[in-house]
């Protein structure tokens, strides 16, 4: 009887086999065997199925948090992010990351090469966090030494080329062409058990009364302001605008830490919705602490703003230029004079009034002449309570970033959000 001990030799397993050698079937058996003898409270599985889809049936098991196929790129990356989270915050429950089709991840220019480094980190640190990785690949050469050397447990099914064997080339040549036949780490012949859909159904019946493992968290298709507010508290001092990151936690912009905010993306990607959410957050601040100056050439925010918080609104080139000049006049009065002490500069108490948030939507439609008066004030923005919140289309951004205004904003290292955009830009 062949037994794989995931509490020895680093806790991970690599399985290699050629076409039709039974790699996917082996993974089904490993998951099913572990699930049969363990409760969902004790063990859970995340499955990345880049093979022929034979692992999809595992999703029926109460132990399985999620199964992602090759066409589900976002779900695949969410699985990797969620499992990586257990490395940072270990749990008593054991977690298995099952990957079928490593040749779609490991080699250079592979379809999912971007997740290879994260998986390598999981393998490197997983043993101390009750996280195990099981990988099936078509050739050992698809696994870079950085990850292959970390996986001591190895099984070989029949390979396409016996010369590729890491266990025994001569024994590889003698293996019959039958799914499940292979070599153990010690060079002994083996036959892996076959797991049918009926077997999986039996395991489901055995654990019918068990509490299922928590399911994989995914981003919603639509996030309303109400859903965002109910999602969870934003970091202290932050203005919430979405959810994301490895933990799908509330994302927020902190104007005190990063006074300026820039969003870039293709047309229709949601930049204006993003600005609307940021302005809703600003509007929740006390009126004596914040006021909005809104440049809105497309009138996307007309009638949606809290008028008590709006100091100025401009929807044309001429009005934009006029309101920016008026704003600059107000802010110039806050510039520190020669008699300001270091203590006053740190406390910012030589002037009184709200911080001014200049919000520019579709900045590509606003002329450089209109924005030019702000340039001289940008280096003093922290001292005078000036915040720039800008959205611009990605087309032509390469040139725009070297223009006077955007160059000055870029030098201040603003918080930056990149939406869908042309890679060449």
What are these regions (language model features)?
Residues 160-220, 422-425:
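Conserved P-loop NTPase
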Residues 13, 199-201, 223, 262:
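Intrinsically disordered, low-complexity acidic/polar segments
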Residues 61, 115, 200-207, 219, ...:
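Generic structural signal of hydrophobic/aromatic residues within well-ordered alpha-helices
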Residues 179-181, 186, 231, 236-237, ...:
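Feature targets compositionally biased, intrinsically disordered low-complexity regions
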């Amino acid at each position: 009887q062949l037994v794989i001990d995931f509490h020895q030799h680093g806790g991970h397993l690599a399985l290699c086999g050629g076409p039709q050698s039974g790699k996917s079937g082996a993974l089904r058996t490993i998951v099913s065997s572990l699930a049969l003898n363990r409760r969902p409270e004790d063990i859970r599985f995340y499955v990345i199925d880049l093979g022929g889809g034979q692992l999809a049936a595992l999703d029926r098991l109460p132990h399985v948090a999620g199964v992602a196929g090759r066409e589900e790129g976002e779900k695949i990356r969410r699985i990797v992010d969620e499992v990586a989270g257990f490395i940072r915050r270990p749990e008593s429950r054991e977690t298995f990351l099952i990957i079928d089709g490593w040749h779609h991840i490991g080699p250079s220019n592979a379809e999912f090469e971007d997740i290879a480094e994260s998986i390598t980190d999981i393998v490197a640190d997983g043993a101390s966090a009750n996280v195990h990785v099981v990988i099936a690949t078509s050739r050992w050469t698809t696994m870079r030494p950085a990850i292959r050397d970390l996986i001591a447990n190895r099984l070989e099914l029949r390979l396409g080329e016996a010369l590729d064997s890491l266990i025994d080339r001569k024994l590889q040549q003698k293996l019959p062409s039958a799914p499940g036949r292979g070599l153990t780490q010690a060079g002994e012949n083996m036959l892996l058990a076959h797991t049918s859909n009926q077997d999986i159904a039996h395991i489901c019946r055995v654990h019918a009364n068990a509490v299922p493992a928590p399911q994989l968290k995914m981003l919603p298709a639509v996030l309303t302001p109400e859903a965002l507010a109910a999602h969870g508290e934003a970091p202290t001092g932050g203005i919430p605008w979405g959810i994301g990151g490895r933990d799908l936690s509330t994302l927020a912009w902190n104007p005190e830490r990063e006074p300026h905010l820039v969003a870039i993306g293709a047309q229709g990607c949601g930049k204006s919705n993003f600005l609307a959410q940021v302005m809703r957050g600003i509007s929740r601040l006390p009126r004596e602490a914040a006021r909005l100056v809104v440049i809105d050439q497309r009138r996307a925010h007309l009638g949606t703003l809290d008028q008590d918080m709006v100091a100025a609104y401009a929807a044309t080139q001429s009005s934009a230029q006029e309101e920016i000049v008026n704003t600059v006049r107000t802010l110039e009065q806050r510039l520190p004079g020669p008699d300001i002490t270091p203590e006053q500069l740190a406390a910012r108490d030589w002037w009184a009034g709200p911080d001014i948030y200049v919000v520019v939507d579709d900045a590509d439609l606003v002329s450089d002449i209109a924005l030019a008066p702000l340039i001289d004030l940008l280096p003093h923005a922290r001292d005078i309570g000036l915040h720039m919140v800008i959205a611009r289309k990605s087309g032509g951004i390469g040139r725009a970033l070297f223009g006077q205004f955007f160059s000055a904003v870029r030098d201040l290292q603003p918080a930056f959000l990149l939406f869908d955009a042309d890679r060449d830009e």
